C-alpha cells in the first residue's frame, strides 16, 4: 500500500500510486471521519513540521543570498551544468521561458539572450533582489522576475514553451506537485528540464543547507513526469565527487490525460553522459 524512499538517515512514505492495493488504501483513508481526534492531532503536527521546514529554508536563503553561486559551486562545477543545459534545451524557437526557483537569476542570464521572453519565479525577496540586480547589469530587458509560490503559479495554463527547474526540486516538500504545476503552464510540445542531484547520502545538505530531498532516482522522476502528462527523455549525467548532477528532460504531451498516463507503466530510461 505504501511506497518507501530512503534518503540518508530518513525514510519517506507515501501511498503507492501503481500497486494493486492503491485503491484500497484510498478507500480506507476516505472512511476515516474528518473529525477524528487522532487524525486532527496528526494533521496539526504535520502542518507545524512543514511550517518549521519552510522557515528554516527561508532563513537559509536570507543568510546565503549574496553567496549563492559560491555554495552551488561546492557541489559541481556550474560551467559544466550550463554547457550541458545549452546542448539539451532547444532554445531556438522558444518565445516564453519560465525558470522556477530562479534564485540569483543565473539561468535567466544564461538563456535570456536566446529566447524572446523569460520569467523567473522565486519565493525569496532577497534572492529576487539579487536577480534583478544581475539582470539589470546584464542588460536583459526581456527578462523579469516575480515573487510567487511554485506550487500555485499565478500564470495561465499553456503559456510557456519551456520550463526550467534548476537545483530547486530538492527543497520541495511535494516535488510531484511542482512538476504538475510546471506541466500545466507548458504549451503542448513544450520542453521541461529538471536539473538536480542524483540520489546521495550527504546528510549535511539536509542539516546545514535545508535540502528536503537527498537527490532523486530516475524512476521516481519519470513517474512524476508521466503523471503530469509529460514524456521523459534520455537522462544526462554529470558525475562529481561526491555528488552527481542529472539533467532530466521531458516534453509536454499534445493531448495529455494525466489520469491515463499515470496508470501507464514507466519505461526504462536511457542515459547519456556529458564530458
Where are these regions (language model features)?
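Amphipathic alpha-helical dimerization/coiled-coil segments
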Residues: 19-67
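C-terminal alpha-helical "lid/dimerization" subdomain adjacent to the S-adenosyl-L-methionine
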Residues: 191-248
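Class I SAM-dependent methyltransferase SAM/SAH-binding core
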Residues: 96-152
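A short glycine-rich, Lys/Arg-flanked "PGG" loop and its adjoining helix->strand segment in the class I
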Residues: 176-191
Amino acid at each position: 500500500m505504501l511506497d518507501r524512499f530512503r534518503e540518508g538517515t530518513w525514510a519517506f512514505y507515501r501511498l503507492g500510486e501503481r500497486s494493486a492495493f492503491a485503491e484500497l488504501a484510498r478507500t480506507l483513508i476516505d472512511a476515516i471521519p474528518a473529525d477524528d481526534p487522532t487524525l486532527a492531532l496528526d494533521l496539526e503536527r504535520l502542518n507545524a513540521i512543514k511550517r518549521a521546514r519552510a522557515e528554516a529554508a527561508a532563513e537559509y536563503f536570507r543568510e546565503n543570498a549574496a553567496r549563492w553561486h559560491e555554495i552551488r559551486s561546492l557541489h559541481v562545477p556550474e560551467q559544466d551544468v550550463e554547457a550541458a543545459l545549452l546542448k539539451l534545451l532547444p532554445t531556438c524557437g522558444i518565445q516564453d521561458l519560465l525558470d522556477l526557483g530562479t534564485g540569483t537569476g543565473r539561468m535567466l542570464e544564461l538563456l535570456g539572450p536566446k529566447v524572446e521572453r523569460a520569467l523567473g519565479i522565486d519565493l525569496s525577496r532577497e534572492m529576487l533582489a539579487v536577480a534583478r540586480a544581475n539582470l539589470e547589469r546584464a542588460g536583459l530587458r526581456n527578462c523579469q522576475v516575480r515573487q510567487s509560490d511554485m506550487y500555485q503559479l499565478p500564470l495561465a495554463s499553456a503559456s510557456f514553451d519551456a520550463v526550467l527547474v534548476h537545483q530547486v526540486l530538492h527543497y520541495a516538500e511535494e516535488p510531484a506537485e511542482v512538476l504538475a504545476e510546471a506541466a500545466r503552464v507548458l504549451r503542448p510540445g513544450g520542453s521541461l528540464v529538471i536539473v538536480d542531484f542524483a540520489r546521495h547520502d550527504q546528510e549535511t545538505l539536509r542539516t546545514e543547507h535545508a535540502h528536503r530531498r537527498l537527490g532523486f532516482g530516475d524512476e521516481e522522476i519519470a513517474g512524476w513526469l508521466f503523471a503530469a502528462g509529460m514524456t521523459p527523455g534520455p537522462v544526462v549525467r554529470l558525475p562529481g565527487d561526491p555528488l552527481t548532477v542529472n539533467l532530466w528532460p521531458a516534453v509536454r504531451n499534445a493531448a495529455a490525460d494525466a489520469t491515463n498516463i499515470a496508470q501507464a507503466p514507466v519505461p526504462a530510461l536511457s542515459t547519456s553522459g556529458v564530458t
